[in-house]
């Protein structure tokens, strides 16, 4: 190893610091070269890592390309390993973005081309970068781009064991899922870096690292910047192919039009000038849009913009000459609409028919009279009355008014008057969308009287609840114009009526007259409310209430007489509490369950007035009436729900939730249901805004109501409990601000205290709430503090949970996964709580949940000595070895075993060196699929470097035969060749028998051939070292004579026959 002496390097100023150490500017006093010195603390690495890193540095010194930072060597001090690198004076592209702003697209394309050239060289040499980002792309004075922090530097940056390795915002999905890094992973990182340079930040930078990792795996591709060219979008979509096997290669990406057409080279100073000018232009255009006088675009007057339909446009100053054919538009449509003569003749015939039909109708007084009676009202009356056909209010609300008591002035305490439950109902009622209610069927639609003809006109009895008779006219399918029957005799359609008319009851006529009188009196009283000269209106309001109590259907007359506005104005004027309460009851009665009337109340300005009575300064009766109105507002239609929210109705709901559940629980029901409804209507109302307003108040009242609802055993409380759970889940699905606002220790403790007592469906919803909350990194310490981990562990092992067990275990396991994934303290607490045997059981029995359980278990060897003690107690090393047969997880499991070997070399080595385990590892490696075995090569090389004993044990003929197959395959990548050579070198150093096995398999010829023919500098260097161990001359290959004689070797005892089952 040709390392630089420490005395030849003088350190200068510090360029940057990190968890691993620091980077300094240095000077090589022997040749005067300025270098960068990366000092890595020896305390941050294991002894086994140190020798490997030194070896790799010596190997990487051979790499030389204009677009990569060159390794100069290394030296070691008492406390640090110093790595000498080429110095790039102008810093990184990340620093350019930070200091000068976004980089223009043409310059990004130029930089990307150079990045890809350097990356292609690394890939051809068998090196995966693993950490491409703007901070690792350096620039020189002449504008050259150089890739830094590849190879050894990447491993050093990841020395903080089991943290988010490298840079999570640039990580490929397969790396996040622990499948392993490949050259395709670098291509994904290139795409993320391009977005970073174009947009200033990488994808998902607004999210916390855990949420970003989740989105990278789940989303089809990261969001692309909106202001880029189509060529740039095409380039990025090639980089963001989800399947790494289908992702484009570096060589092909260099031929993409986006990087080809932007090849104008520029110096660093010119590039900085271009970046500065670009960002100045962006700022200028933004400021112009803000500072520019709005008079040229928006006229701040009442009649600005387009002409109002209520005002005539100004007449032009210059008269416009009228064209000769001013009203003739035939020429305008000539050639676009051709009407045939046949159609025109039919149209003329139809017009003649219509005129004849009208003449017959006008001449017949008998047939026209029913029509005239139906159209006696004006159009406004018809449109108003149509809203009340088959009204659902008449029957249920009739029971509220006792004729023996004064009208509407009695107490409506729900405990004294059970009838009032139909007002504040907790039963869910789905809204009818606006514009659809006219298509809703009524009971009358099922009579089919317009389909099946009858021979007579029936006069039905008067309905008591309306006081009106219903005349049902049924006619035959024959035309009304037929004046004679088949026998030629004139028929009288009213023959059958005479006998039925004799049956009319005089009482019905009296009821009809009485209703007419009451309607007239009601109209008069409403008129008197409008009269400003009347002093006291208390008596008038009482009389209106009395009339309405006599006949509830008369509320239609109030609506048709436009009585809503007088009632609201009177409510504003009158200060007498009894009359105010009576008016509130009147308005609620008229508007109950009728979205049209509710909208009229809102349009008349009544919504803020009605909401004002929900404040605590008013008595229970007033707040109760306000609650009735509020419930109708959010239940009736989407439009009224939007009106309610726009008038700060959410504040009233939050006030209701704060009420005492024991005495005023109806208010709590209204508050909970209202917020639940608002969060469900996400198509109309921004869900995140509602969540923000809810958490800005407090989470305490909601959790207290949850506790009280669980303690009360009735249907309304159970429904309210479910809705509170769903509200909490909705809040946890909002943005990070809302999630962080939910981190209230007392509230979370209250929820966890009742979690095990919730119904199973509500328990699953609440566990989803904690799962979402656990995705915020700032929540981990608090969740650990409130002891959620022992509770989740208990739920996983609770055999009493039967109904919904699968869903509950799934949510609990997902929450435990989020809490433990990146936090060692949480992992240790889970281990102490008894999670290991439960996770093992899940992995064995349930393949669906294995995706969550196994990563938790695989992280534990690096969690600390306490965790490893529990791993030994539960025989987890043997358990991991048994999992090597799973093709989907074998590389991740083998990597975990290698990590455990680094921490506890003697104990783990003893188990792995057992004959059955050695054969198992060799068997798994040799019969695994190509992609999986390639991923295992890197880990196997690490194991052989750490443990010479294991290297000697694994050096058997069967593995060398596998190596030969891979080395002689034409498509073998340089990185695979490098890994194989490193493993063979470690095996030769560990055992002379391995040298004999290598010779027996014919590998020396293969190695010598690659030494001569490979394009990779690193492959050639390793081949030379390997041939020294094999004692093979390094001259030209003699094809007719083997360089060494092959000793007679017995065939291997085991040969792979069939692949392992997954």
UniProtKB/Swiss-Prot annotation:
Q: Which stretches does UniProt call biased (Polar residues)?
A: 296-310, 376-394
Cofactor section: Mg(2+)
Q: Which InterPro entries does this chain map to?
A: ARM-like (IPR011989), ARM-type_fold (IPR016024), Kinase-like_dom_sf (IPR011009), Prot_kinase_dom (IPR000719), Protein_kinase_ATP_BS (IPR017441), Ser/Thr_kinase_AS (IPR008271), STE20/SPS1-PAK (IPR050629)
GO molecular function list: ATP binding; metal ion binding; protein serine kinase activity; protein serine/threonine kinase activity
State which Enzyme Commission number(s) the record gives: 2.7.11.1
Function description? Protein kinase essential for cell division. Plays a key role in initiation of septum formation and cytokinesis.
Protein name, UniProt field: Cell division control protein 7
Give the organism's phylogenetic lineage: Eukaryota, Fungi, Dikarya, Ascomycota, Taphrinomycotina
């Amino acid at each position: 190893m040709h390392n630089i002496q420490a005395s030849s390097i003088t350190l200068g100023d510090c360029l940057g610091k990190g968890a691993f150490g620091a980077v300094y500017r240095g000077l090589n006093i022997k040749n005067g070269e300025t270098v960068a010195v990366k000092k890595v603390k020896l305390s941050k690495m294991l002894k086994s890592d140190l020798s490997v890193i030194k070896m790799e540095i010596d190997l990487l010194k051979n790499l030389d390309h204009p677009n990569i930072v060159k390794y100069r060597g290394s030296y070691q001090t008492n406390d640090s390993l110093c790595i000498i690198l080429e110095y790039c004076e102008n810093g990184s592209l990340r620093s350019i973005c930070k200091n000068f702003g976004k980089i223009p697209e043409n310059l990004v394309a130029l930089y990307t081309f150079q990045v890809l050239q350097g990356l292609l060289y690394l890939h051809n040499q068998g090196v995966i970068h693993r950490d491409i980002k703007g901070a690792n792309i350096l620039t020189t004075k002449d504008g050259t781009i150089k890739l830094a922090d590849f190879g050894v530097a990447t491993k050093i940056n990841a020395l903080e064991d089991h943290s988010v390795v490298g840079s999570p915002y640039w990580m490929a999905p397969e790396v996040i899922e622990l499948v392993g890094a490949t050259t395709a992973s670098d291509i994904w990182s290139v795409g993320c870096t391009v977005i970073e340079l174009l947009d200033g930040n990488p994808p998902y930078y607004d999210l916390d690292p855990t949420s970003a990792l989740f989105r990278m795996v789940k989303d089809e591709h990261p969001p692309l910047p909106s202001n880029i060219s189509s060529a740039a979008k095409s380039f990025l979509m090639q980089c963001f192919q989800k399947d790494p096997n289908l992702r484009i290669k570096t060589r092909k990406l260099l031929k993409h039009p986006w990087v080809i057409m932007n090849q104008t080279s520029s110096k660093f100073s010119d590039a900085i000038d271009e970046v500065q000018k670009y960002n100045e232009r962006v700022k200028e255009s933004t400021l112009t849009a803000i500072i520019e006088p709005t008079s040229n675009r928006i006229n701040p007057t009442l009649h600005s913009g387009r002409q109002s339909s209520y005002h005539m446009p100004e007449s032009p100053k210059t008269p416009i000459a009228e064209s000769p054919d001013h009203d003739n538009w035939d020429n305008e449509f000539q050639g676009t609409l051709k009407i045939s003569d046949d159609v025109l003749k039919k149209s003329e015939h139809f017009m003649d028919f219509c005129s004849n039909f009208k003449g017959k109708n006008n001449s017949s007084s008998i047939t026209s009279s029913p029509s005239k009676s139906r159209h006696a009202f004006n159009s406004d009356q018809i449109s108003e009355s149509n809203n009340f056909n088959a009204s659902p209010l008449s029957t249920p609300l009739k029971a509220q008014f006792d004729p023996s008591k004064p009208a509407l002035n009695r107490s409506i305490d729900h405990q004294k008057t059970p009838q009032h439950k139909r007002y504040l109902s907790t039963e869910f009622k789905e809204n009818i969308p606006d514009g659809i209610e006219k298509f809703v069927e009524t009971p009358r639609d099922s009579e089919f009287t317009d389909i099946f003809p009858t021979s007579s006109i029936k006069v039905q009895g008067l309905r008591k609840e309306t006081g009106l008779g219903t005349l049902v006219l049924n006619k035959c399918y024959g035309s009304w114009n037929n004046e004679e029957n088949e026998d030629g005799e004139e028929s009288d359609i009213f023959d059958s009526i005479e006998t039925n008319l004799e049956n009319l009851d005089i009482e019905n006529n009296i009821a009809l007259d009485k209703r007419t009188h009451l309607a007239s009196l009601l109209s008069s009283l409403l008129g008197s409310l409008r009269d400003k000269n009347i002093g006291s209106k208390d008596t008038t309001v009482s009389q209106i209430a009395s009339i309405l109590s006599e006949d509830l259907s008369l509320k239609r007359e109030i609506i048709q007489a436009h009585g809503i506005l007088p009632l609201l104005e009177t409510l504003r004027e009158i200060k007498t509490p009894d009359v105010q309460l009576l008016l509130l009851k009147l308005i609620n009665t008229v508007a109950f369950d009728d979205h049209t009337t509710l909208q009229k109340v809102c349009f008349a300005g009544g919504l803020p007035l009605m909401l004002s009575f929900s404040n605590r300064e008013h008595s229970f009766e007033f707040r109760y009436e306000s609650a009735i109105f509020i419930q109708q507002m959010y239940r009736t239609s989407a439009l009224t729900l939007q009106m309610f929210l726009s008038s700060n109705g959410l504040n009233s709901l939050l006030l209701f939730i704060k009420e005492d559940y024991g005495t005023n629980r109806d208010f709590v029901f209204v508050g909970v249901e209202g917020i639940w409804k608002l969060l469900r209507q996400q198509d109309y109302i921004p869900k995140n805004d509602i969540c923000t307003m809810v958490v800005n108040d407090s989470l305490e009242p909601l959790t207290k109501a949850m506790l009280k609802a669980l303690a009360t055993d009735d249907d309304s409380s159970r429904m309210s409990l479910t809705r509170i759970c769903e509200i909490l889940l909705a809040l946890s699905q909002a943005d990070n601000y809302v999630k962080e606002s939910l981190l209230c220790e007392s509230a979370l403790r209250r929820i966890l205290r009742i979690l095990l007592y919730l119904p199973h469906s509500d328990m699953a919803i609440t566990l989803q709430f904690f799962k979402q909350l656990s995705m915020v990194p700032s929540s981990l310490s608090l969740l650990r503090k409130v002891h959620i981990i022992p509770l989740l562990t208990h739920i996983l092992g609770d055999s009493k949970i039967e109904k919904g067990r699968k869903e509950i275990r799934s949510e609990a396991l997902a929450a435990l996964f989020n809490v433990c994934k990146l936090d060692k303290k949480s992992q240790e607490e889970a281990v102490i709580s008894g999670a290991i045997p439960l996770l093992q059981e899940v992995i064995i029995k349930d393949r669906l949940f294995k995706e969550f359980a196994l990563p938790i278990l695989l992280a534990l060897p690096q969690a600390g000595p306490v965790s490893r003690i529990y791993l030994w107690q539960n025989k987890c090393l043997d358990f991991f070895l048994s999992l090597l047969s799973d093709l989907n997880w074998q590389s991740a499991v083998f990597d975990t075993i290698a990590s455990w070997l680094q921490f506890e070399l003697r104990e783990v080595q003893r188990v792995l060196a057992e004959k059955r385990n050695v054969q198992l590892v060799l068997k798994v490696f040799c019969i695994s699929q190509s992609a999986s075995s390639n991923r295992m090569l890197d880990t196997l090389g690490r194991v052989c470097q750490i443990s010479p004993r294991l290297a000697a044990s694994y050096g058997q003929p069967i593995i060398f035969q596998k190596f030969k197959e891979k080395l002689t395959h034409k498509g073998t990548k340089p990185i695979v060749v490098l890994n194989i050579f490193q493993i063979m070198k470690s095996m030769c150093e560990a055992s002379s028998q391995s040298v004999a096995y290598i010779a027996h398999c014919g590998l020396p010829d293969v190695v010598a051939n690659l030494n001569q023919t490979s394009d990779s500098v690193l492959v050639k260097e390793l081949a030379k070292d390997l041939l020294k161990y094999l004692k093979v001359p390094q001259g030209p290959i003699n094809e007719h004579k083997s360089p060494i004689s092959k000793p007679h070797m017995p065939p291997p005892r085991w040969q792979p026959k069939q692949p392992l089952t997954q």
